[in-house]
Amino acid sequence: MKRTFQPSVLKRNRTHGFRARMANKNGRQVLARRRAKGRARLTVAG
């Protein structure tokens, strides 16, 4: 059986990247929560 995690930087960024987060309201809420919490990295890309 193949492993489920087959890394791809392109897929990672398209799903979890900064621009993907900014593209809709809920994603912006994610960023706002992470800023409020004081995260050093808001997204996998940043």
Curated annotation (Swiss-Prot):
> What PANTHER family does the database record attribute to this sequence?
LARGE RIBOSOMAL SUBUNIT PROTEIN BL34M, MITOCHONDRIAL RIBOSOMAL PROTEIN 34 FAMILY MEMBER
**UniProt GO BP:** translation
Report keywords, A-Z: Ribonucleoprotein, Ribosomal protein
Record GO cellular component, one term: ribonucleoprotein complex
Stated family = Belongs to the bacterial ribosomal protein bL34 family.
Q: What are this entry's molecular-function GO terms?
A: structural constituent of ribosome
Superkingdom assignment: Bacteria
In its UniProt entry, what is this protein called? Large ribosomal subunit protein bL34
